[in-house]
From Swiss-Prot:
The keyword Transcription belongs to this UniProt entry's keyword annotation: yes
Assembly behavior: Component of the 7-subunit TFIIH core complex composed of XPB/SSL2, XPD/RAD3, SSL1, TFB1, TFB2, TFB4 and TFB5, which is active in NER. The core complex associates with the 3-subunit CTD-kinase module TFIIK composed of CCL1, KIN28 and TFB3 to form the 10-subunit holoenzyme (holo-TFIIH) active in transcription.
Swiss-Prot/TrEMBL GO biological process terms: nucleotide-excision repair, preincision complex assembly; transcription initiation at RNA polymerase II promoter
Function: Component of the general transcription and DNA repair factor IIH (TFIIH) core complex, which is involved in general and transcription-coupled nucleotide excision repair (NER) of damaged DNA and, when complexed to TFIIK, in RNA transcription by RNA polymerase II. In NER, TFIIH acts by opening DNA around the lesion to allow the excision of the damaged oligonucleotide and its replacement by a new DNA fragment. In transcription, TFIIH has an essential role in transcription initiation.
Organism from which the protein derives: Gibberella zeae (strain ATCC MYA-4620 / CBS 123657 / FGSC 9075 / NRRL 31084 / PH-1) (Wheat head blight fungus)
Signal peptide: none
SMART domains per record: Tbf5
Compartment(s) where it occurs, according to its Swiss-Prot or TrEMBL record: Nucleus
Protein name (database record): General transcription and DNA repair factor IIH subunit TFB5
One Pfam family it belongs to: Tfb5
Protein family membership: Belongs to the TFB5 family.
Keyword Membrane belongs to the record: no
Length: 71
């Protein structure tokens, strides 16, 4: 008998999608279906955890912001 899994459609830039695919590649816990370069369907109950991991990964990759003080 077929099983249904509730999912959420995520639309993002290809660069962000590649990070999401990279996060999922370890255990395949998040992605239900990889649709195209900008869209992916993610398990509904895993969206908040995926957001947290994505934010952590982005913080690692982005340079720290410089303070814009003119002293």
């Amino acid at each position: 008998m077929p099983r249904a899994i509730r999912g959420v459609l995520i639309e993002c830039d290809p660069s962000i999608k590649s990070i999401i695919v990279s996060i999922d590649s370890a255990n395949h816990d998040y992605i239900i279906e990889d649709l195209d370069d900008e869209r992916v369907v993610v398990k509904e109950n895993m969206v908040s955890m995926l957001k947290a991991k994505l934010e952590d990964r982005l913080k690692e990759n982005l340079p720290p912001e410089e303070e814009s003080g003119s002293e």
